[in-house]
């Protein structure tokens, strides 16, 4: 995966396979809660129970690229273990779009804007999760983008790329890879690492910004690159957050 920052003042591409992209604009939904800020902007709102007690994840997928039920269960369990939300709902919905083999971030944002139907209102915080065929336009010979957290309540998963990557790794399952990518991207929405959730102690990889220095942590940069997934995915273990990342979340309203 690869992390991408975009703002009025700068465009910054990180050399990794997870992505973060904050779109321009500050459109508001019907509850006046902004959902077009950069990833990490809503970290405290997602983690704590102060503004929103409930979280609603709207999973939108194209035909043939629906995420596995086990992966979504892993996501729900993770949200329950790291946030203070009272109710967690994940809804899946097939969307009909013009399929492409390569998607730019502009394409992804447009797909969300046309198809997203759940927004943050009253005590419910809404998260948008897109699952697409094809691949990212940011793929290179050395990097394969598996997912991108591109707005404060939005991330995209390139499901076809995940399937292809899993098929190329002996002993690896799609569920392990898929779950890892989703949890990693969701953690960027939670503001890790130093992306809206302040660090208790410094553990940000300064070479690969917004990632943890601990190579065994879920937020380590290398495990998000599809080209490097064979280093960890074959073990059939989803990487966990390390102590520093957990402490950061706890200090910002999580657990």
Where do the PLM segments sit?
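Sec-dependent signal peptide recognition
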Residues: 2-10
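C-terminal motif of bacterial Sec signal peptides marking the signal peptidase cleavage site
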Residues: 14-17
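Propeptide-to-catalytic entry region of secreted or membrane-anchored zinc metalloproteases
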Residues: 19-136
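Sec-exported extracytoplasmic/periplasmic mature domains
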Residues: 80-88, 187-195, 250-254
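Active-site-proximal segment of zinc-dependent metalloprotease catalytic domains
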Residues: 121-200
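The catalytic-center signature of Zn2+-dependent metalloproteases
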Residues: 169-243
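Surface beta-loop-beta hairpin patches that serve as ligand-binding interfaces in beta-rich domains
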Residues: 238-255
């Amino acid at each position: 995966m690869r992390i991408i920052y975009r703002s009025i003042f700068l465009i910054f591409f990180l050399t990794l396979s997870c992505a973060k992209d904050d779109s321009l604009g500050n459109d508001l939904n019907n509850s006046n809660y902004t959902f077009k800020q950069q990833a990490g902007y809503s970290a405290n709102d997602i983690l704590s129970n102060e503004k929103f007690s409930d979280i609603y994840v709207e999973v939108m997928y194209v035909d043939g690229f629906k995420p596995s039920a086990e992966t979504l269960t892993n996501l729900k369990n993770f949200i329950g273990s790291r946030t203070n939300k009272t109710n967690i709902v994940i809804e899946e919905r097939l969307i009909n779009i013009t399929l492409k083999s390569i998607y730019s971030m502009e394409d992804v944002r447009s797909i969300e804007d046309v198809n997203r139907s759940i927004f943050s209102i009253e005590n419910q915080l809404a998260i948008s999760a897109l699952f697409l065929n094809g691949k990212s336009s940011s793929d290179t010979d050395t990097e394969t983008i598996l997912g991108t957290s591109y707005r404060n309540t939005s991330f995209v998963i390139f499901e076809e790329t995940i399937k292809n990557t899993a098929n190329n790794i002996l002993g690896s399952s799609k569920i392990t890879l898929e779950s890892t990518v989703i949890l990693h991207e969701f953690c960027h929405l939670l503001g890790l690492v130093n992306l809206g959730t302040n660090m208790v102690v410094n553990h940000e990889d300064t070479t690969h910004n917004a990632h943890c220095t601990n190579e065994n942590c879920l937020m380590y940069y290398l495990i998000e690159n599809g080209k490097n997934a064979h280093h960890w995915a074959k073990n059939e273990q989803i990487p966990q957050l390390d102590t520093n990342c957990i402490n950061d979340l706890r200090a910002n309203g999580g657990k």
